[in-house]
Swiss-Prot record:
This is Sulfoquinovosidase. Gene3D superfamilies: Glycosidases, glycosyl hydrolase (family 31), Golgi alpha-mannosidase II. Its EC number is 3.2.1.-. Signal peptide: none annotated. The active site is at residues 388, 391, 455. Changing residue 245 to Q: 6000-fold decrease in catalytic efficiency with PNPSQ as substrate. 250-fold decrease in catalytic efficiency with PNPSQ as substrate. PANTHER family: SULFOQUINOVOSIDASE (PTHR46959:SF2). Keywords: Glycosidase, Hydrolase. Structural analysis revealed the molecular coevolution of catalytically important amino acid pairs directly involved in substrate recognition, as well as structurally important pairs distal to the active site. The gene is smoI. Changing residue 270 to Q: 6000-fold decrease in catalytic efficiency with PNPSQ as substrate. 250-fold decrease in catalytic efficiency with PNPSQ as substrate.
Length: 664
């Protein structure tokens, strides 16, 4: 990082790129204070800010590696910047400051990606993105009926920026990355052509910069900084993880699915803990131990599945329901977060209340990791689980570490991931047991081995359907999350919105070219088509699992590459074709490693797919073998069972890819 004083200010550059430019006429820093209103209803937040002061810190005094900022000469200094390697450390010199704004130099044709896992817009330029972990919303588009109904019935419609996994990090087409080290509510605003504005509801510890000669170099550096995941477990490559929550009937249904030729790696039964019925649908009983009524002799069943090479997976989240046996155990030990009166804080999760296990209390975190993850899950025979939630930390509770819950809210998903990882490590199962999360924040990369895209609607909608999963994979992948996957067929079914056979098949086609194939019955299984209820759907699903398994050698090579370099399995086109700006905003197709390009069909009724093939070499259409020159737009036929997939003609894996055509 290069710091240079100017006539009346300073500039900061990294890799010959000016990132910050400060002068009295165009200040880069603003400070002040505000009063926020934050209301949470079942994980959905209504947030407003009343800004009382926003003052430009126009005057800079430079002394060695530090800069002191004030509003004008002779005024009291309010902020100190200290240069530290490729970071700027910030110190508030005025205790009243609880709002900071920073303007980063921008170019008009610049593209910006990141922000954690973004589901609607991969290229964030031109929009404003609040960064606060929450439910992402149902519909996520204020122009749609489902979003409107979700807002009216449960304040749950959401918007384009809502995400389970925000992160104050971006990658710029100027070949640098920026990270704000804070857990406070923050906003990335990319609406101005001359600058990017960062808003933070605290003075952050530091702002870090990363630069490289290529996008891949920067992504690799980010992954090293935040932490890398181990390679995928070998058992995953055996086929799909079948999600069923049908009690003991799940085993018979699995046999039917396998009899159709489906390649299966695991049976995932969320309801291993039992069910409760709510107006939303069938919900789980949030007490994390095997339910003998729902699954009698489950330990024996798990052993029988293991003999057939099939793993068993379950479900857990960081809360305990008040009517379960684990709740009084945790409460008597003082493991729950408390309210203002010092009593256990209860959170409404939709017609039932839960306590929040306080992971800032080391004893509580250790108890959860050992007693629940260790004994109740791993020792019982589970090989993996959905580690759900993490976004619901109320902002008015009291925590063991004494830190304001508003500052711990964003940090909670990473603490949750750490508890899971600690339990896995305690049994020597790191890289063998596979848990997956939807919630995330800075540092989750070091603990969570697999991201899943959260709760999509069971449809083809632009902001909450199949296509959003691609955007989520690409954005989170740039942040150092190598592995991403989704619920095949989506999850959320409300207001008469139900799955079609076409949706399941198109989602399956995409999933076959992702790190993990996993089905989900959804929130209302009885209202929605399942893979074993339609012969055509099941036959299609079985074939796509065979393709996934046949691709395993290639996927293993990508997993090894991810562990070594941090590059994600699913990559934006520009990662390998950075000199082709037309790839910068592409978010509905992806590179599967460097050698494959996947363009899923994401609109209902479509049997053709138009896409851009990058580069100067030739691409081979996977199903027909026809060659296409790179560097141009093409349209191909995409009947069911043949998504638009291409591979590089000069790939060292070309023989493996050619064999996929023979799978009937």
């Amino acid at each position: 990082m290069h710091f240079e004083t100017t006539k009346d200010g300073f500039t900061i550059a990294i890799g010959n790129r000016i990132i910050l430019s400060h002068s009295p006429d165009k200040p880069a820093f603003f400070a002040g204070f505000g009063e926020e209103r934050m209301d949470m209803y079942r994980g959905n937040f209504d947030i407003e800010d009343y800004v009382i002061e926003r003052t430009a810190l126009r005057h800079a005094e430079v002394s060695g590696d530090s800069v002191t900022l004030s509003s004008a000469p002779g005024q009291a200094p309010r902020l100190r910047l200290t240069l530290d390697g490729n970071a700027i450390r910030l110190t508030a010199l005025d205790e009243t400051i609880n709002r900071l704004w920073l303007r980063v130099v921008a170019e008009t044709d610049e593209h910006v990606w990141g922000g954690g896992e973004q589901m609607s817009y991969f290229d964030m330029r031109g929009r404003r993105f609040p960064l606060w972990t929450s439910e992402p919303g149902v519909g996520r588009d204020k122009t749609t009926e489902i979003t409107f109904k979700s807002d009216v019935s449960g304040k749950a419609g959401g918007d384009y920026y809502n995400t389970n996994y925000p992160q104050p990090t971006w990658l710029s087409s100027r070949k640098y990355a920026l990270h704000v080290e804070t857990s406070a509510y923050s906003v990335f605003d990319f609406r101005n052509g001359d600058f990017h504005e960062i808003e933070i509801w605290a003075v952050p510890e530091k702002i870090e910069f990363f630069a490289g000669d290529s996008f891949a170099d920067i992504v690799s550096a980010l992954s090293l900084h935040f932490g890398r995941q181990p390679e995928l477990p070998d058992w995953v490559y055996n086929g799909a993880i079948i999600g069923l929550k049908d009690g003991v009937n799940s085993f018979a249904r699995l046999e039917k699915i396998r009899a159709a030729g489906t390649k299966v790696s695991g049976l995932w039964c969320e309801d291993w803990v039992g069910l409760r019925q709510t107006s939303f649908g069938a919900r789980l009983f949030w007490d994390w131990q095997a339910n003998d009524t729902r699954y009698p002799h489950l330990r024996q069943k798990i052993a029988e599945l293991a003999d057939q090479g099939i793993r068993f997976l379950g479900y857990v989240n960081p809360y305990l329901c008040v009517d379960g046996p684990l709740f009084p155990v945790a409460e008597s030990a003082g493991y729950f977060a408390t309210d203002v009166d010092g009593k256990t804080a209860l959170v409404d999760f939709g017609e039932f209340d839960c306590g929040v296990v306080d992971f800032t209390n080391p004893a509580a975190a250790d108890w959860f990791a050992e007693e629940i993850i260790g004994k109740n899950m791993l020792d019982f025979g589970l090989s993996g689980w959905m580690a759900d939630f993490g976004e619901y930390l109320p902002i008015d509770i009291k925590l063991s570490n004494g830190v304001d819950a508003k500052l711990m809210h964003n940090a909670w998903p990473t603490l949750w991931a750490e508890v899971n990882a600690k339990g896995v490590e305690s049994r020597g199962k790191t890289g063998e047991a596979l848990f997956f999360m939807r919630a995330g924040f800075t540092g989750v990369q070091a603990h969570c081995p697999l991201i899943w895209g959260g709760d999509q609607s069971v449809d083809f909608s632009r902001h909450d359907g199949l296509v959003t999963v691609i955007c989520g994979a690409l954005s989170s992948g740039l942040m150092g999350n190598a592995y991403h996957h989704s619920d095949i067929g989506g999850y959320t079914s409300l207001f008469g919105n139900v799955r079609t056979a076409e949706l399941i098949m198109r989602w399956t086609e995409m999933a076959a070219f992702t790190p993990v194939m996993r089905t989900h019955e959804g929130n209302r299984p009885r209202d929605n088509l399942q893979i074993d209820q339609d012969e055509t759907v099941l036959a299609h699903f079985a074939r796509m699992t065979a393709i996934y398994v046949a691709l395993a050698p290639y996927l293993k090579s990508l997993s090894a590459e991810a562990a070594k370099t941090g590059l994600p399995v699913q990559r934006p086109l520009f990662l390998h074709y950075e000199n082709e700006p037309q790839t910068y905003a592409v978010q509905d197709c992806y590179l599967y490693g460097a050698d494959m390009l996947v363009a899923p069909v994401w609109k209902a009724g479509e049997t053709q797919r138009s896409l851009y093939l990058p580069g100067h070499g030739e691409w081979v259409h996977l199903w027909s073998g026809k060659r296409h020159a790179g560097g141009r737009d093409i349209t191909v036929e995409t009947p069911l069972g043949e998504p638009a997939v291409f591979y590089r003609a000069d790939s060292s894996h070309h023989r493996l890819f050619e064999q996929l055509r023979t799978i009937g």
